[in-house]
Amino acid sequence: TVARNAAGEDPSDSLVLDGSIGLDLQWVKVDGKLLASSDYLREAESLTIFNLPDQCVVSTEVFIKPHLNTTMMGLYRSRTMYCTQCEAEGFRDITYYLDRPDVMAEFTTTVVGDLQQYPILLSNGNPIDRGIIDGDRHFVTWHDPFKKPAYLFALVAGTLSVVNDSFVTSSGREVHLQIFVEEKDLDKCDHAMLSLKRSMRWDEEVYGREYDLDIFMIVAVDDFNMGAMENKGLNIFNTSAVLVNSKTSTDAAFQRVEAIVAHEYFHNWSGNRVTCRDWFQLSLKEGFTVFRDSQFSSDMNSPTVKRIEDVNILRTHQFAEDGGPMAHSVQPESYMEINNFYTVTIYEKGAEVVGMYHTLLGGENFRKGSDLYFDRHDGQAATVEDFVVAMEDASNRDLSQFRRWYKQSGTPVLTVTSSFDKQAATYTLNFKQYCPDTPGQTGKLPFVIPVRLGLVGAEGEDLVLNSEGHTQVIFEVTEVEQSLVIDNIAVEPVPSLLRGLSAPVKLDYQYSDEQLAHLMAYDTDGFNRWDAAQTLSLTTLQQLAEDSFEGLELTLNGNLIDAFARLLKDESLDPAMVALMLQLPGEALMHQLADTIHPAAIHDARNFVRVALAGALKDNLLDIYNRFNTPIDYRPEADQIGRRSLKNAALGYLMLVGDTGAELAWLQYQQADNMTDKAAALSALVNSPAAADYATQALKTFEQQYRDEALVMNLWLQIQAINSQSGGLSRVEALMEHSAFTMNNPNKVRSLIGGFCSANLVNFHSADGAGYRFLCDQILSLNKTNPQVAARLVTPLTRWKEFAEPHSQLMRSELQKIADEPGLVKDIYEIATKSL
């Protein structure tokens, strides 16, 4: 049923419905009357119906061919089932409709299928009717009482097994929980179900949000472009985001499942009950929900470790996006293809912006603001401005300047200098902010930057910063230049700045090596302790990369060795923290920070430091490995995960010196009773020139053991794809012929091709340009079958201007080839042309 919007200014009596070229229109009816072909106009992407009354019922019938749909948008086939993906604009590939997020309707869906072939028929909401048709067919009717836009529609039909459970809400309602999987995967659902129940309870306790339907369903799909989709009451998940057990999944996979299950469940309120008015408001639901799932993961595990993981993603990927040709604001003003704006800026930077509300307003006011937002806009398609106003009204604070975080693109740089006046016993911090120009934006205005900070004394103590006795404060930088004077400081301290990365900015403070080592040893903020280790390592790596490019002999500064030695001996630290502090900054981050990128020099410098540290600290590393390499019943919980991560970090270093590491890794591979340890050992062997025989044997036995486990074989592909030894491209091309790989499965494409091009940088960026030509060929191949996956693969080529020759022109040449391809879809065209 459609009705004219009385507020609309267009006097036309025509209705334009979104559609696609794949819809085979059979008929159109208005109020039950069959229309003549002259009463409507069908075009490639729309259906216009003429001369409609102000209110009427419009009916259409279309034929579609989902079994031929390789884009995995709309309705398509995956192995034994049919399923859907409608966000952002997939519903128009199923039927004609007003396919935009502000058009919300109550859906009743009847699914009909062969009883033997498709015994499971699912859609949104609650089942209200079912029955048999002609003996061999059946139907199920689903009703979703909550109005929703078409992007939240879902349908599944297939032969599936189910894991059942239940949850009692805070008001006493019992909700039926179901996870549908292929029968062979029934033993991999327990963790997802536990994560779902924890998420439901947490959202009640922390945000006051109770589930609203009688049933909540998750379906695991092997062929899926995304991680998961929050369709109302019927979440559809990539198998990699829901299926885990200790024999087939790593600790990281367990944590990923927990986070994604939570994220999609939290969308029931921040995305479904309150959706977004248009796709320019995408971060309204995604940034808020990423922040919520990060809070949840922090509460379930280690808050410090979770924050470090989030910041690593932000600095490596989002800061790079901010500094490249695809830079855009959290609330972009235009796009060519909406699928290209499901980005780290919208999601991760959007979450950082929400986190700054929490920091600036405090937890209590933030909760008041979120409650007000949900209460005001329940059942509506809202805007970013609605969210900001709710926070303003709840906290009685003017957030006018804060809104710049939504409109201005780029990563602000916060430069800090300090001075100490011993006679006056004052310590002064001077702050200066600026934001570099980005495509289409110059002359940025000052942001509101909350700087959480402390001062660490000469003996490692936290110094008092104000008359209230606080040892940590939040200083708001709102001007281009500002200063903070702290009294009663007798001895010059070391500043601990931007604790927890309290704002998504780049910090420029000229720490000495000694100051960084001091923070590594004494800072009571765990994040900044790790960050000091990263900064100390990064300073060393950047200098060595420069030396390597200049052809100079490489030598390692003793300060880094000493700092790492102290770290390995500090038994007071959480093992997970030590493991993270042992990880050197990655090559991708070094690429992002370099003025001109020399891939081989960066790789050689990082490898040199790893080898030098391993040689100098071999005994300490061996002690760590032996201490944590003890038999224990597997649990995917924070304490055990930390122990395994530290043990395997030590093993990675030990592989670089002598034969000890190779023998330990081979023994660990053979004896491991969990996939975390087995995969870590396999990766260590594969990346070691000294362990070639062991690696060959391990890869062979791994394949034999797990050849029927698709997700495990994806890991097998990925480990080989990111092997940084020479010959990487040849190995990848050979693996593309392996039975474990197919271009038709996005997970496999991401594991092998994506892994090679994004995480094996020294091989991808070979000076002959073979890696670039290879990637171009794969993108153009996928252009014909799955443009959304293809578009994601373009990213490694987009920053060609920052590379030294011959890389720069070789990358540009392949980008130009992509842009010139006849029949190129707009997903890829937009990224390629903007990058050129």
Q: What is the predicted function of each stretch?
A:
Residues T1-R4, G19, L52-N69, F107-L115, ...:
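Short, hydrophobic/aromatic-enriched beta-strand segments in well-ordered soluble domains
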Residues E61-N164, D525-W530:
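Extended, low-hydrophobicity, Ser/Thr/Pro/Gly-biased non-transmembrane segments
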Residues T316, D487-L836:
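Long, ordered, helix-rich scaffold segments
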Residues I21-V30, D398-Q401, T411-L497, Q542, ...:
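Beta-strand-rich binding/interaction modules
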Residues A3-L23, Y96-D99, A105-D114, E385, ...:
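Surface-exposed beta-strand/loop patches in extracellular or lumenal glycoproteins
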Residues F341-D375, Q408-L445, G500-G526, D531-Q542, ...:
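Long hydrophobic segments that form regular secondary structure
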Residues S12-S14, S20-S78, D134, V477-P493:
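A surface-exposed beta-strand-loop module
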Residues D31-K33, E89, W142, S171-Q423, ...:
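Hydrophobic alpha-helical and helix-loop surface patches within well-folded domains
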